[in-house]
Amino acid sequence: HYMHSDQWRYEGDFSEYAPIPPKTKWAKGHAADLEAAAVHQGWMPFFPQFKDNPIDLVRQAQDSGAKTDGEITQWAVKQLKDKKMQFSVEDPDAQENWPRIWIIWRGNAIQSSAKGHEFFLRHYLGTHDNIVAEEHAKGKTKTVKFTEPAPRGKMDLVVDLNFRMDSSALYSDIVLPAAFWYEKNDLNTTDLHSFVHPLSEAVPPVWESKTDWEIFKAFAKKTSELSSFAFPKPVKDLVTAPLKHDTPDELAQPKPLNWHAGECEPVPGKTMPHLQVVERDYANLYNKFISFGPKVREDGLSGHGIKIPVKEQYDELLKNPVGGTPDSRHMRCVEWDGKKYPSIEDTLDGANLLLQLAPESNGEVA
């Protein structure tokens, strides 16, 4: 948000704010350039990813002779190295790089949790604001392009899931009435202890409100229904992922060299973000939303460098019947395209599945 809300435009060189050692490598220049370097080196994610549509980039790679997913990523690496392909962070104010849809969920971003609220009003929404700061970044950035004039109103659509008419809802194009805490089934826990707090629905959601799960499920269903107009068949997408904490990725850069500056070679997953080709089957997006896929059976669950095999638990889940109504005491499966999957169609299905696979609640997994 620092880049897209154009807050970087109102900041100058580091030397304007504090004394800087003469031979320092990092504490110099402009914050926007350091953020661009962090994206180039795989230290942080940034969306949109590229100035070109990643689905179109895959097609370009295939037209250039790339046949396998590995060849597609190799093509992309060469394009990036030759500066024929550009990360969006390098030119955040180009229209191709604007974020267009903002879905606000479980927070009051506008006028509350968004740091630099007035900049969001001006550059995200294009509405009235009370900014008194002047732009200082012109001529101060080397990697990030400074475009004039600064764009106002980047967002085409703002959607808010909310049970309050707070400031985010007031500024949104669409407000989707969400269920209150006591109108949904949920699981609460934290990373500080292993206690699990199940919350049961006291009353159903009132009027037109829905639970978060049902709202996102409706998104998936409508996307599947409309997919035939744009994506009648599965398409391949080029996806970046940052280097991850508590994984071998942490050993990838003993020296933080920047390939974009010519200090080293671009190597996905080592000196730059991971690059992966992912197949998007939008026609089956809803089916996949309500199903717990089979990949976890082979790969297991992982986090913080620890892998937990759950093959036995997955096979046990497949023994449950297909169909029926959601029940906190029984589990279900769904079936589509001739295959059977553990169901996560309802929040009760999802909660039961989590309790079945979590080591905190299933001693066999622990």
Regions found by a protein language model. Give the residues of each.
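Domain-level signature for respiratory redox metalloenzymes
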Residues: 1-160, 165-366
